[in-house]
């Protein structure tokens, strides 16, 4: 388990909702003051969290049907070369290959202020779209409430996951994430099969 995975597993302890997790992540996203030093580790932790969402939350896992999912540093060299991606990450935080071999590029953006709108320049969204040009779908996954219209209108193959999506993640999904991080088998919730007459 990496250091970030270990930290995230600890943060997920006794967490049942995004509302409970968000303040814990914010502690890893601070400016330099008299009592704190600057850290942006929350961004990396949010990337790991996003990966877990695509693996274990039904809204994401069913829609995107992940065959393979990689943090940028985990992308195999041959796939990186096929997509003409640089060795250093410049905006793509996750890469998903679905069961139809479609490539989904994901950028993750964590904000302490969830009411803020993601900005094209300040949040460097252009880097993501520039380096992810060979992807079939472009996703921005953020806890912010909105995104600039420029990003929304850039391509038809775009999806923005916002604060409202995070609010819908179930307590059972948070438990699956924590369980997966600590290396225990994840229990799948089976839906009852309706009888023929139902």
Predicted segments, located by residue:
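Nuclease catalytic cores
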Residues: 23-51
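Sequence-level detector for tyrosine residue identity
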Residues: 28, 48, 56, 64, ...
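ATP-dependent helicase/translocase motor core
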Residues: 3-5, 14-18, 77-80, 129-198
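Homeobox/homeodomain signature
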Residues: 11, 36-39, 184
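Catalytic centers of nucleases
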Residues: 40-133
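Generic N-terminal initiation segments characterized by hydrophobic and/or small/turn-forming residues
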Residues: 5-9, 18, 115, 122
